[in-house]
Amino acid sequence: MVACDLLWLAAASCLLTLVFPSTTHQGYGNPRNTSNVDLDCGAPGSSSAGICFDPCQNHTVLNDPSRSTENTVSSEECDSHLRGWYRFVGDGGVKMPETCVNVYRCHTYAPMWLSGSHPILGDGIVNRTACANWNENCCFWSSEVQVKACLGESGEYHVYKLQGTPECSLRYCTDPSTAPKKCEIACRPEEECVFQNNSWTCVCRQDLNVSDTLSLQPLLDCGANEIKVKLDKCLLGGLGFKEDIITYLNDRNCRGTMKDEPNNWVSTTSPVVANDCGNILENNGTQAIYRNTLSLATDFIIRDFLVNVNFQCAYPLDMNVSLQTALQPIVSSLNVDVGGAGEFTVTMALFQDQSYTHPYEGSKVLLPVENILYVGALLNRGDTSRFKLLLTNCYATPSGDRNDIVKYFIIRNRCPNQRDSTINVEENGVSSESRFSVQMFMFAGNYDLVFLHCEVYLCDSTTEQCQPSCSTSRLRSSEPAIDLTRVLDIGPITKKSVQNPDTSNGTPRNTGFLLAWPTFFLPVFLAWLF
C-alpha cells in the first residue's frame, strides 16, 4: 500500500488501494479491465508518489467540435502535447468513439478511437488502448490511456488520462452522438431528441400509443388558392397509421395520400373554390368560410377504422365570394379566348356600396333617388398572375341593345369621363378586378330604364402597359371602335319611386340611400357629351 497524503485523504480514512496495470491491450478487442482505482497518484519512487487526487475533480476541459468523427476536414492537427487528465465537452461529443474511425476525420490524418468499452460509475480508473487508423489498419498506432466514469451536476461523464500520441498527425476523436442533446427546435411531447443522420433532430417516439382522435388537431395554411391541412405524423402513428395514409374529402373523388412535411408533419390540400371537393362555402357578412372534412384511412378498402378531421378557413369577404354566396346576384359573364393562353371567364356585377361585397340581387335593380351605383368586374378563371382585366369602354344605354346609338360613356378609351364628377374609377388594368362607381341617372324622354355595357380587354402584363395613362388629349379622342363580342351587358336599372317605398324587387338588403334624382335629361346631348 502506498502512503496517502493526509491533506488529500483525511475524509476518506486512507482507504486507497492501488492496483497497477499489468496487461497491455493490443488491437481493438480488449475486454473490460476494472482496476478499482478511484484516485490518481504520482508514480512510485517519484517526489509526487504520495500526492493523490480524484481526476473527476482535477482535469482539463477540451471543448473542440472539430474532434467530431463527422468532421471530414483534413488537417495536420496532432495531440502529441496532450498529457494528463482531460474531459471532452461541447457539440463535437463528450466521449471517445468505441469503433474504428475512417482516416482524415476529426481534423487530422490518423484519427484515434477507444478500443474497448467505457467504464461505468463504480469501476474506478480503468486502462484502455487508444488506436489510430492508418494504412488500412484500425490500430496502426496505439497509446495507453486511462478512463474514469464521473458523476456531476449535469449527469455522468468520463475523463481520460492521455499520454500524447506515438506519432503525428494523430488526434483523439469524439463521438458526436454523445454530445448534449441539442435539437434546433423544442420537441413536442410525442417526439424525442436523437442524434440521426449526423445531427440532432426530433423524431417520433416509438412507444407512443394514442387513443383519443380529438388530439389530432390540424394545422391549417389558408392560402389564396388552396387550403393545406397538416397533421401530426407522430400522433397518426400512435393511432395506428403507417407511412401510406389514404385521404378523402367530402367529395370522395378528391382522394390521395398525405405528403411529408418538415418536423414530422404530413399534409394534404383542398382548393379554395365553392363546391370543389365538397367544399361548403358560407358567408357571415364579413367573412367567407370554407368548410370540409378530411377522412383518413389505412387502405382504399375501409372496414372498421376511419378518422374524420373537420376543418375550415375564413377569408375576408371579397367580390368573387360575395357573388358565389348570393342567392340571385345580378351578374353578366363572358368567356374570352386568348390565343395561346387559354380561355378566361369575366364576370360583371352591380354592388350596393364601396366594399363591393354586397351585390344587388333579383331580376332588376330598383334604386333610391341619386344613389351611387358600384360596378365590379373580375377574372374568375384563367392566369390572373399574367393577365390583368382592363375595361376599355363602359357606357349606358336606354335599351338593352349594346349597339344603341344613344350612349353615355362612363369609361371611354380606357379613361373615365372627366366631365362627370360623380365617376370614380377605383381599379382598372392593375389586377384581375376592375371597379368603378357613378351616380345613377335616367335618360330624358320616354325612357324608364338604364342598361350598362362594358367592353373588356385582357392585358398581358409581361408585354404590355396595362394601367391606363389618361392625358387630356386622350380624353377628347374620337368615338371608340367597340368590339361587341367582348362586351358585358347588365341591367335593367330603374328609378325607385319615392311614393313606393315598399318595392323590394332587386333592392339592396341594406337600405338607407335616399338622395335626389336629377330632374333634367337630354338623351341626344348625353349621347355625344363625351
Swiss-Prot record:
It is a lipid-anchor; GPI-anchor. The keyword Lipoprotein applies. Residues 484-492 are annotated as: External hydrophobic patch (EHP). Residues 315-338 are annotated as: Flexible ZP-N/ZP-C linker. Residues 1-21 form the signal peptide. Residues 506-530 form a propeptide. Each ZP domain consists of an N-terminal (ZP-N) and C-terminal (ZP-C) region connected by a flexible linker; the linker allows the ZP domain to wrap around the ZP-C subdomain of the preceding subunit. Functions as an intestinal M-cell transcytotic receptor specific of type-I-piliated bacteria that participates in the mucosal immune response toward these bacteria. At the apical membrane of M-cells it binds fimH, a protein of the bacteria type I pilus tip. Internalizes bound bacteria, like E.coli and S.typhimurium, from the lumen of the intestine and delivers them, through M-cells, to the underlying organized lymphoid follicles where they are captured by antigen-presenting dendritic cells to elicit a mucosal immune response. Interacts with SYCN. Interacts with bacterial adhesin fimH. This is Pancreatic secretory granule membrane major glycoprotein GP2. It comes from Rattus norvegicus (Rat). The gene is Gp2.
